[in-house]
C-alpha cells in the first residue's frame, strides 16, 4: 500500500525527521485557508498521486503568490496526472500539498528497500539526488552507496556515519545525516515498510539537512497490525477493478491485452501469462482467485474481468490441490450462467478429480472450451481472441 507524500511526511515528523511545514487542500476554495497556515510568500505546490515523476510531468510547481497557487489547484484538482510511472490514463489528483520552501545548496538521494536475497534492509544513498536519479542509477551506479541493516538490530549509528562520509558530509551535517538515518531505520522496521525514499534530501545554505520529498510503501501483509496506516489508504489511486477485487480477496492486476486470465495461485498465474505470450497472445490481467476458489469468488472474478471492454476471451486455469476440480467445474458453469458471459471461455483443469471436472464441463449446455493441457488451453485462448474458435 502506497502513501501520499503529505501522509509520509506526517510519519516523518512523528519520528523526529526534518521536514518543512505543509498543508493539504482538496478544493480551490481551500487554498487561501491552507496557505494562511504556512509562512513565507512562495510555496511548493505538489499534486498528490501514487506515482513518481511528478516534477517532470508538471505536477510540482513553485508558486510565487496566492493567485498562482489558486491557478495551480484549479488546473489540477479533479484531473489526472500522467507520469512515466503511470499508465496512459494517469492517476487522479484529488489533493494538492502546499509546502514552505527553502534554499538548496546540494541535493542528495536516500532510500531503503527490503533485500530478499540477504533477508535484510538495504539503505541506498547518493550525492546526486533530484529528478534525474533514474539516470544516475543507469549511467553512474558508482555514485550509489549502500549499507545493509539487520532487522533484528536496526540501523546502527556507525552505518549512518559511514554513508554520510561517502556523501562528503562531515561535522554537523554528518551528525544530522546519522540522526536521519536512524529515524528512517526505526520508521522502516516499526511500520513494516517495503519501500522508503527521500528524494531529494537537501542541504540548505544554513547547513541543515531537510527531507523535501517522501515516498512510502507499506507491506500489505503487515497491514493487519497497522490500523493507523490502513486508515490512510486512498483507494481512488487504485485501478477500479483492483479495488473491487480486494473486497473479495482476489489478487487482480490490470494489463493491456485481450485474454482475461483466471487462475488459482500466483505462480501458476504468472506461468499462465507467460505461456499465453509464448503462443502469441496478450494477457488482459493477472487474477489469482487463491486456494478457496468458491462459486461466489469465481463469479466475482468473471465480473471483474468482463468490466474490461478489451477482453475477447477468458482463460480459466485451475490446479485442484486443496479444491476438487469437479466442484470448480460446477462453480464455473454456475458463474458463467449467473454473470451472463458473452465471450468464449477456455477451461483447463488439472489435479484432484480433473477428469470428472472436464466431463461435467463437456456435458453442460454452457459454451465452454475444455483443454487437456496448459499448452492446448493457451492455443485455444489465443485462437479465440483472434476469432478463430
Swiss-Prot record:
It catalyses: succinate + ATP + CoA = succinyl-CoA + ADP + phosphate; GTP + succinate + CoA = succinyl-CoA + GDP + phosphate. Pathway: Carbohydrate metabolism; tricarboxylic acid cycle; succinate from succinyl-CoA (ligase route): step 1/1. It holds the Pfam family ATP-grasp_2. Gene3D superfamilies: ATP-grasp fold, A domain (3.30.1490.20), ATP-grasp fold, B domain (3.30.470.20), Succinyl-CoA synthetase domains (3.40.50.261). Residues 9-244 form the ATP-grasp domain. Keywords: ATP-binding, Ligase, Magnesium, Metal-binding, Nucleotide-binding, Tricarboxylic acid cycle. Substrate binds at residues 264, 321-323. ATP binds at residues 46, 53-55, 99, 102, 107. Mg(2+) binds at residues 199, 213. One of its GO terms (molecular function) is magnesium ion binding. GO terms for cellular component: cytosol; succinate-CoA ligase complex. Its EC number is 6.2.1.5. Coiled coil: none annotated. Its cofactor is Mg(2+). It is an enzyme of class 6 (ligase). Binds 1 Mg(2+) ion per subunit. One of its GO terms (biological process) is succinyl-CoA metabolic process. Succinyl-CoA synthetase functions in the citric acid cycle (TCA), coupling the hydrolysis of succinyl-CoA to the synthesis of either ATP or GTP and thus represents the only step of substrate-level phosphorylation in the TCA. The beta subunit provides nucleotide specificity of the enzyme and binds the substrate succinate, while the binding sites for coenzyme A and phosphate are found in the alpha subunit. Heterotetramer of two alpha and two beta subunits. Belongs to the succinate/malate CoA ligase beta subunit family. This is Succinate--CoA ligase [ADP-forming] subunit beta. The lineage of its organism: Bacteria, Pseudomonadati, Pseudomonadota, Gammaproteobacteria, Pasteurellales.
Amino acid at each position: 500500500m502506497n502513501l501520499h507524500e503529505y501522509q509520509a511526511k506526517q510519519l516523518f515528523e512523528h519520528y523526529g525527521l526534518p521536514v518543512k511545514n505543509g498543508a493539504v487542500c482538496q478544493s480551490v476554495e481551500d487554498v487561501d485557508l491552507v496557505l494562511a497556515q504556512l509562512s513565507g510568500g512562495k510555496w511548493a505546490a505538489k499534486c498528490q498521486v501514487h506515482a513518481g515523476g511528478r516534477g517532470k510531468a508538471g505536477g510540482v510547481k513553485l508558486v510565487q503568490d496566492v493567485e498562482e497557487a489558486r491557478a495551480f489547484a484549479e488546473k489540477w484538482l479533479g484531473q489526472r496526472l500522467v507520469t512515466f510511472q503511470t499508465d496512459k490514463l494517469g492517476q487522479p489528483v484529488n489533493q494538492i500539498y502546499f509546502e514552505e520552501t527553502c534554499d538548496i545548496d546540494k541535493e542528495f538521494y536516500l532510500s531503503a528497500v527490503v533485500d530478499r536475497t540477504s533477508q535484510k534492509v538495504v539503505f541506498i544513498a547518493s550525492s546526486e539526488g533530484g529528478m534525474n536519479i533514474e539516470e544516475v542509477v543507469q549511467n553512474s551506479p558508482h555514485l550509489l552507496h549502500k549499507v545493509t541493516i539487520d532487522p533484528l538490530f536496526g540501523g546502527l549509528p556507525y552505518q549512518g556515519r559511514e554513508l554520510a562520509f561517502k556523501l562528503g558530509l562531515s561535522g554537523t551535517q554528518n551528525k544530522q545525516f546519522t540522526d536521519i538515518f536512524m529515524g528512517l531505520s526505526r520508521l522502516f522496521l516499526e511500520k513494516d515498510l517495503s519501500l522508503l525514499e527521500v528524494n531529494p534530501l537537501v542541504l540548505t545554505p544554513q547547513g541543515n539537512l531537510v527531507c523535501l520529498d517522501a515516498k512510502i510503501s507499506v507491506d500489505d501483509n503487515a497491514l493487519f497490525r497497522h490500523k493507523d496506516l490502513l486508515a490512510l489508504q486512498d483507494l481512488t489511486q487504485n485501478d477500479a477493478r483492483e479495488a473491487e477485487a480486494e473486497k473479495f480477496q482476489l489478487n487482480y492486476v490490470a494489463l493491456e491485452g485481450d485474454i482475461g486470465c483466471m487462475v488459482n495461485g500466483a505462480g501458476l498465474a504468472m506461468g499462465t501469462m507467460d505461456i499465453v505470450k509464448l503462443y502469441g497472445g496478450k494477457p488482459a490481467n493477472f487474477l489469482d482467485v487463491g486456494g478457496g476458489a468458491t462459486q461466489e469468488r469465481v463469479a466475482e472474478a468473471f465480473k471483474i474481468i468482463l468490466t474490461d471492454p478489451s477482453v475477447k476471451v477468458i482463460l480459466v486455469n485451475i490446479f485442484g490441490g486443496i479444491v476438487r476440480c469437479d466442484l470448480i467445474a460446477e462453480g464455473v458453469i454456475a458463474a458463467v450462467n449467473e454473470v451472463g458471459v458473452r465471450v468464449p471461455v477456455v477451461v483447463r483443469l488439472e489435479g484432484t478429480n480433473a477428469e470428472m471436472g472436464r466431463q461435467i464441463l463437456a456435458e453442460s449446455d454452457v459454451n465452454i472450451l475444455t483443454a487437456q493441457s496448459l499448452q492446448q488451453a493457451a492455443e485455444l485462448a489465443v485462437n479465440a481472441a483472434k476469432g478463430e474458435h
